[in-house]
Swiss-Prot record:
Its EC number is 3.2.2.9. Substrate binds at residues 78, 152, 173-174. Catalyzes the irreversible cleavage of the glycosidic bond in both 5'-methylthioadenosine (MTA) and S-adenosylhomocysteine (SAH/AdoHcy) to adenine and the corresponding thioribose, 5'-methylthioribose and S-ribosylhomocysteine, respectively. Also cleaves 5'-deoxyadenosine, a toxic by-product of radical S-adenosylmethionine (SAM) enzymes, into 5-deoxyribose and adenine. Thus, is required for in vivo function of the radical SAM enzymes biotin synthase and lipoic acid synthase, that are inhibited by 5'-deoxyadenosine accumulation. CDD domains: MTAN (cd09008). This is 5'-methylthioadenosine/S-adenosylhomocysteine nucleosidase. The keyword Hydrolase applies. Disulfide bonds: none annotated. GO terms for cellular component: cytosol. Keywords: Amino-acid biosynthesis, Hydrolase, Methionine biosynthesis. The lineage of its organism: Bacteria, Pseudomonadati, Pseudomonadota, Gammaproteobacteria, Enterobacterales. One of its GO terms (biological process) is L-methionine salvage from S-adenosylmethionine. Pathway: Amino-acid biosynthesis; L-methionine biosynthesis via salvage pathway; S-methyl-5-thio-alpha-D-ribose 1-phosphate from S-methyl-5'-thioadenosine (hydrolase route): step 1/2. Homodimer. Belongs to the PNP/UDP phosphorylase family. MtnN subfamily.
């Protein structure tokens, strides 16, 4: 099995990249892909850049050039579920855009024409992630993750997301674009991220302070998940 892993920022991939053995680097379209073995399992780790376009471009390049069997999206996220704290884990069962609006033509809010309203994560990947969470004794929430090209740190943006997606557990800037590409390629995906901030008016300060904590927790989870998928 070859496992594709996608993170947006340097801080979100560096811990995993440093553990890849026999590492080779591929630079394509502004993205970097690191291939090799993580604890004996073949992986391709993508640093995509921030935002939906960068994530979709990178995911497409990763799928075309490296042909992974599954995709794990890692990194940080802003917490929406009330129980979440910095360092806690969120696992997607679905991903949706929070900044797409074609409702004038009868689509659901967040749905694009020709696409489902939401992109469902793979049940087996979710189960494997939840098994890892239990083994690592981490706090985690599973549910809807929403994405858009905005860092949410104000009451207006937060209120809009809560109104349109009251069930959402976390918000970030890439996951749904990656899920969209995986849907088109028919490749299973799951989003496994760690909370860096709570999406409020101070979230930009929290993000800067706690990004390293989130990166460490999400990398720990991904490393465990890779082992679980490869060896059961």
């Amino acid at each position: 099995m070859k496992i594709g892993i996608i993170g947006a920022m340097e801080e979100e991939v560096t811990l995993l990249r440093d553990k890849i053995e026999k590492r080779q680097t591929i630079s394509l379209g502004g993205c970097e892909i690191y291939t090799g073995q993580l604890n004996g399992t073949e992986v391709a780790l993508l640093k995509s850049g921030i935002g939906k376009v960068a994530a979709a471009l990178g995911a497409t390049l990763l799928l075309e050039h490296c042909k992974p069997d599954v995709i794990i999206n890692t990194g940080s996220a802003g917490g929406l579920a009330p129980t979440l704290k910095v360092g806690d884990i969120v696992v997607s069962d679905e991903a949706r855009y929070h900044d797409a609006d074609v409702t004038a033509f009868g689509y659901e809010y967040g749905q694009l024409p020709g696409c489902p309203a939401g992109f469902k994560a793979d049940d087996k990947l979710i189960a494997a992630a939840e098994a890892c969470i239990a083994e690592l004794n981490l706090n985690a929430v599973r549910g809807l993750i929403v994405s858009g090209d905005a860092f949410i740190n104000g009451s207006v943006g937060l209120a809009k997301i809560r109104h349109n997606f009251p069930q959402a557990i976390a918000v970030e800037m890439e996951a749904t674009a990656i899920a969209h590409v995986c849907h088109n390629f028919n490749v299973p995906f799951v989003v496994v991220r760690a909370i860096s901030d709570v999406a409020d008016q101070q979230s930009h300060l929290s993000f800067d302070e706690f990004l390293a904590v989130a990166a460490k927790q999400s990398s720990l989870m991904v490393e465990s998940l890779v082992q679980k998928l490869a060896h059961g």
